[in-house]
């Protein structure tokens, strides 16, 4: 086989992978927006609902660690609610606000990272492996025993298997699917953004905590977090779609 033929085959293969990944992006967005609104398919939406709750609660806990506090444990429940238990220094209003914001914007930051990794097959495998490893570690270290541990361990294990066994195009598609879930989680759970009281606990919501610590109306902080997540989603999509349609010399090198 001549070098020109090998280069042509690599180019065709790369284009096929890009098309698969773009199709996965489109169907991921459609599924995320449609499943909760179709009664017959509502059961299929539940695992995605739980995933958004995990992302939200881990965002709180990891932010607490980043600002010098502790992340004790977290729990998610079959109805989609969840709670993260963390500790901060006394009278740390600003830190409290940051921890509250972490649950709202943290998933969008993770999504942007995954969109960047999904531009290349190897990056997609690395992203899936990191995701799976993080969920397995969270299940072992900070997840509440029972439903939370089972869900995190199962999803994390599946992600590790996917990283090892999926073809290049499917690995990219899987990571893009997860990135879309993270990006849209703050919108599919609009109760996170524009309510003063968290349901069903009746405690102040994250945006109410931010308003108490930093001033201003709670809905303004919800709007700010929502716009930040939207910006990350748009930038991630532009970066991903632009890169997936280009061929580099590295892609064609034998």
Give a label for each model feature.
Residues 249:
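Active-site rim/adjacent substrate-binding subdomains
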Residues 2-34, 42, 79-244, 252-254:
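Metalloprotease/metallohydrolase-associated module, dominated by Zn2+-dependent proteases
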Residues 39-96:
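Small-residue-rich helix-interface/hinge motifs
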